[in-house]
A protein has these predicted regions:
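N-terminal assembly/interaction segments in proteins that build large macromolecular machines
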Residues: 2-262
């Protein structure tokens, strides 16, 4: 790993964990530069505490949303630096990609094989853009929702222009009308962007995520010197808090922290 890449990764890891330079370097050396594994390493050692920043992808880029007649699509395109995310060629590519994403209902194979306005396929335009800008650019993920019997609500965080920003959340609610629920739907979308829940309820959180968190918690407690008989008891309390903190209905409402979303 070059010194520049190492320093960039240390900076990212420090921003995500709040941990000092030396410990971040040790973690990156131990994990061969893998940021996600470095976070896990620091948490198991008890050096870093879990935070929402850690669950965000350590990359720049743009997210875009498009809605029309009850249908809504989202797409996220990642770059390596914020500088590229402000590049006009990159922005225009993302805008056209958002239109294609909506038309193809977020089928990534169809997206890549769709011709853009210049007559060139998306996948080839992407290669050309990477060559021109000199940075890795990827279509990270895309999604499409059809909610003709209800309402869609979206929130764009750090919007650069309409329907484009750093983070986008969408709430799909069936069987309601806009007149009665627009304000609530928009606020829930804003809450999700701020709180980043894994699932609607705690029982819906992916078992692999829960198992991994429990493994980290148990390692952290063991490394703190607590006796073995205390590990299970403390782990239960910590994993219960984790499940509540990361499920929408059990999170504290950002508009009124004394209440839960449910």
């Amino acid at each position: 790993m070059s010194n520049k890449i190492l320093l960039d990764n240390i900076k990212k890891l420090r921003e995500m964990t709040g941990v000092g330079f030396k410990d971040c370097k040790i973690a990156l050396d131990e994990t061969k530069g893998d940021i996600e594994k470095s976070i896990e390493f620091l948490r198991k050692k008890g050096i870093a505490k879990a935070s929402k920043k850690m669950s965000r992808t350590a990359s720049e880029g743009l997210a875009l949303v498009k809605e029309e007649k009850g249908q809504i699509s989202l797409i996220e395109i990642n770059s390596e630096t914020d500088f590229v995310a402000k590049n006009l060629d990159f922005i225009n590519f993302c805008k056209e990609l958002s239109e294609i994403n909506f038309k193809t209902k977020s089928d990534l194979n169809k997206i890549n094989d769709t011709k853009m306005n210049n007559g060139i396929l998306v996948k080839d335009n992407l290669v050309n853009l990477i060559s021109k800008i000199g940075e890795k650019i990827i279509i990270r993920r895309a999604n499409f929702f059809d909610n003709l019997s209800g309402m869609n609500f979206s929130y764009v965080h750090s919007a650069t222009e309409k329907d484009i920003g750093k983070i986008i959340s969408v709430v799909k609610i069936a069987g309601i009308s806009e007149a009665d629920n627009k304000d609530l739907g928009n606020k829930i979308a804003m809450h999700i962007a701020a709180s980043n829940p894994f699932a609607i309820d705690k029982d819906d959180i992916d078992k692999n995520i829960v198992d991994k968190e429990l493994e980290i918690i148990e390692a952290e407690i063991a490394n703190s010197g607590k006796p073995p008989e205390m590990i299970e008891k403390i782990s239960k309390g910590k994993i219960s808090k984790f499940l509540n903190d990361n499920s929408l209905l059990n999170q504290f409402w950002i508009m009124d922290p004394k209440k839960k979303v449910s």
